[in-house]
Amino acid sequence: MDCIAIALLALMVHSEAGTEPLDGKIAVAYVAVNRATMSGRTLQDVLTQPRQFKINLRLRVSESSAYAARVALNRLQPDPTGGADHFYAHTVVPRPGWYDE
């Protein structure tokens, strides 16, 4: 795993779930790792695909977001998503069509 992919994952976690507790951040990190694994693409390719994940380059990554990225990348604990490759914030958007799949 290259340093750019690791940094991008930590930045994505902080951008998408910066205000969530650690378990939420870990879940978001696992979603990206799962998507890369399932698609056979690199993590960097998955993270930089248009309109998939928010990555705010102006943010300073918190320790907990960086830790969550390390947990998912190194599979330091069981995947709390059960292998999910998508997530959504129910407080931000209505239930997406793929939710029940």
Language model segments and positions:
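Bacterial extracytoplasmic/cell-wall-associated proteins, especially those involved in peptidoglycan
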Residues: 3, 7-101
